[in-house]
Amino acid sequence: MILILLGPPGAGKGTQAKLLAAEYGVPHISTGDMFRDHKARGTELGKTVQAIMDAGGLVTDDITNEMVKDRLSRPDVAKGFILDGYPRTSAQAEYLDGLLASAGRAISRVLSYEVAEEAVVERISGRRSCPKCGAVYHVSANPPRRMGYCDRDDAGLVQRDDDKPENVKKRMAEYAAKTEPLKRFYSARGLLATVEGIGTPEGILAVTKRVLAS
């Protein structure tokens, strides 16, 4: 089974990727994990990515594709894998198609987790984090015992700039602009399936499994 997961920030895509990986016994592969792995191993790709990020630049398709190629050459992907955060563009999607075809493999399904903008804004803008220990809370879903203060060390909680409503909306708009061509790409190939991303992680997993079985 080879799955690709799409979804805006706050849609719970990463959580579903982990649950699906455990359910089907295949690795969950995210671009963030790949970057961190190469950085930790001190590879040439890792050094290149770090230099680009330190300079405030964007990692090119070629570099990302090379990391994916390296990751998919490992034996743990023999039964399949779940990709989270890649591909992000139609060019990357075409590269992945060619890479898989050269190994006699193909994508099983592309799952797009859809969540209304208001729900995403509420979900993300409610996050509060502790600047001291890094603990993360949510004002309604997972509040601290004393509102505004960390349970562990009583430090004042803060809202990250990325989590402010106006910035969440901006990220949503950027995601939509980048992802619509990708969704059209996979829809034209009959691979795209939409999953409602509202509910408990377990409930969404159950819906996802029904979609995969259909």
From Swiss-Prot:
GO molecular function annotations of the record: adenylate kinase activity; ATP binding; zinc ion binding
CDD domains for the chain: ADK
Entry binding sites for Zn(2+): C130, C133, C150, D153
Gene3D superfamilies: P-loop containing nucleotide triphosphate hydrolases
Pathways per UniProt: Purine metabolism; AMP biosynthesis via salvage pathway; AMP from ADP: step 1/1
Top EC group: transferase
InterPro entries: Adenyl_kin_sub, Adenylat/UMP-CMP_kin, Adenylat_kinase_CS, Adenylate_kinase_lid-dom, P-loop_NTPase
Reaction catalysed by this enzyme: AMP + ATP = 2 ADP
E.C. number: 2.7.4.3
First-listed, main subcellular location of the protein, grouped into a coarse class: cytoplasm
Localization of this protein: Cytoplasm
Positions contributing to ATP binding: G10, A11, G12, K13, G14, T15, R127, V136, Y137, G199
Quaternary structure note: Monomer.
Family: Belongs to the adenylate kinase family.
Annotated domain remarks: Consists of three domains, a large central CORE domain and two small peripheral domains, NMPbind and LID, which undergo movements during catalysis. The LID domain closes over the site of phosphoryl transfer upon ATP binding. Assembling and dissambling the active center during each catalytic cycle provides an effective means to prevent ATP hydrolysis. Some bacteria have evolved a zinc-coordinating structure that stabilizes the LID domain.
NCBIfam families in UniProt: adk (TIGR01351), PRK00279.1-2 (NF001380), PRK00279.1-3 (NF001381), PRK14527.1 (NF011100)
Name recorded for this polypeptide: Adenylate kinase
Organism: Anaeromyxobacter sp. (strain Fw109-5)
